């Protein structure tokens, strides 16, 4: 199991990952930006070009185009004054089926199975309930030594949602046109 502070998921490709899901663009503390942040790096870090340099009260700062912002959180590590964490609007998402290893097959990417889960520390009861539901179903149905991704691949994603009782929504459909069937996930060279 892995955790990550945003959907970029540097936590890796664990069997189950719990990630923070930001739902609002960052709030900028303009007084600190010029002293703390290297502005060109922050602008370059945004995957959708939603951040641009600005002057606020005569000081160099940054501004966010909220229509473009996808709330990924990539701007926060290089510029902490761009606070994206929010007690009310930051939610949790659970991803399943990742595997970096290529010992028995190619590596697999995680898939979103639950999103918009309330972020209620310190025990996170809603997230814990979803993870327990997944683990209980996995324990009952998986073969010995079968990883989560192998189990899901064997039964299929529709059966996974059916067995776990998790709701299937339009956000679970991988419809990104830029992906190929394998996303060249294998470490083997192909010509």
Located regions from the model:
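Peripheral terminal and linker regions in Fe-S/redox and tRNA-modifying enzymes
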Residues: 1-191
């Amino acid at each position: 199991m892995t955790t990550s502070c945003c959907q970029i998921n540097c936590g890796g490709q664990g069997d189950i990952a719990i990630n923070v899901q930001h739902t609002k663009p960052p709030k900028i503390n303009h007084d600190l930006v010029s002293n703390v942040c290297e502005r060109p790096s922050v602008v370059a870090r945004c995957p959708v070009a939603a951040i641009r340099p600005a002057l606020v009260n005569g000081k160099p700062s940054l501004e966010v185009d909220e229509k473009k912002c996808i709330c990924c959180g990539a701007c926060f590590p290089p510029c902490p004054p761009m606070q994206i964490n929010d007690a009310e609007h930051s939610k949790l998402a659970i991803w399943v089926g990742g595997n970096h290893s290529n010992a028995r097959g190619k590596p697999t990417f995680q898939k979103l199975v639950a999103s918009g889960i309330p972020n209620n520390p310190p025990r996170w009861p809603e997230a814990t309930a979803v993870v327990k539901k997944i683990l209980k179903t996995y324990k009952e149905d998986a073969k010995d030594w079968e990883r989560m991704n192998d189990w899901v691949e064997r039964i299929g994603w529709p059966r996974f949602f059916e067995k776990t009782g998790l709701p299937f929504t339009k956000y679970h459909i991988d419809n990104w046109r830029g992906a190929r069937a394998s996303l060249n996930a294998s470490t083997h060279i192909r010509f």
